[in-house]
């Protein structure tokens, strides 16, 4: 039995488990069996089988990766993210599952050697290729299982991630599946028309369109592209007809229809008959009559409806698909040449791993989604005796969310606990004495009472300070005494079962979590966390063989109280704080925010003039190696200043002039002048984020 290839059957020794580290008995036993290469006569029925590749220190800490997953990685990681034996996070190649995972901390180290500092947005091309593959293959499998007579054509909505390296790879990876693109503006249409998509792929044009937009879409047919112009209004139809006749190019049309079903989730407003886009039932009938009158009814080949983004509930999806199918049947009865049923977006991502209908989760699998869609469409078409249409979906989030992660360092932490003992001194205020004495009387039975008393005494002492009746050093001792009580209460709570805590006690102690100050901008890199309370899994990238000993919230580097994260994905759901490790001043502590590939890059803003981060795309390879495919440097200070109408060259000239005056008026030396100007110039060239020396 050797190394990673060694497997052993573990049997339970009933008489000696109490001697082993808590939570590690099975792992420790396996270690002993491996080293001795023998099985004691005490052992009975085989119960567990697993690889033995764990380092020796792993069995001495009392905290075992295999027995404990603080962050719920096994639930939300989807096989892409896992914990390595050294306690680091590893990235697993879903295209080659037998490959050794890539150590994410090692990726950061190699990037830094190239001069690429964190924060960095890391894209993994394997993850993107795999998602496109499994979405298309899941639909094809469902079509075979149901006996559906049509086919599937997916399209990627460019708005979900417009970045060139992303769209280009989607076009490449989607080519075997005739995977197309969806656009909602002229700029996005120009992107789509430049991509090498499969000739069978669809280019679907949504959004409001002027004559130039329509002209581009019509002319693209001369390139052999299947471009469908989806009508958003009756007025738009008249413009399409006018431009089409001017060019002498017949249009290929779709119609966007508002359905009455309203779904749950953050984006429920995009569904229902009060949604912003699409035609009402009455307007659809009007459009059909206009097309009939203009002899263009055969041009109407696609019906589009949009359910919304990140729809968590499968029942709602089925109802939506049923309604869309019935409408398709009725429009076809009016004489339209409908061939494509575009069901829009909605396929969600399980950010929390809860498999629930909460906004950040989904209560269905990809396979269930595809099967339910195909089955529902097929049933309705069969019932009406209508030929099965080609099913189209615009599953942007499900394509790209998992493929990107934000990696950043923790700069420092602020703790609200004190380990130091505060002793009463002669002449101390009685309230301070009472606060200090609470530590001696603390027990598991009076935790909430003691917290109430400590808070009362501290608040009264603060009031005395405000009235000038207490000195600053005495108030500082009171604050330390209060923090010590909090620390003692938290330690006692860790030894108790959750059932022994009161909810109030838990909330109040969590509300006093540490603050970990991190090198990123929430507004630039994770805007949905600020805007709609979106959850992204956030975990340490190292030290996962150690038990976290701190509870924390995260703050970014912006000077804004909203630049904080205080809801986190953990093993048992969602928590108000994140378990983390105490910082080591001799070692960088990195965190990763996962599944950030959908919408975040373009929605990010320049709050405090923190610009785009460095962006790197890698390819996971064999033997735990990776290949650097693309690197895009983050914004420099100079670039960000130019975005807000400053001319960096002019700024430098003005600063030089001011520095010259300083030499004349304040006696600054020429050497100091030179250093000032040099520092200013270098700062203009620098990264907008905190840079390590």
Report each predicted region and the residues it spans:
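N-terminal, intrinsically disordered charge-dense segments
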Residues: 1-21, 50-53
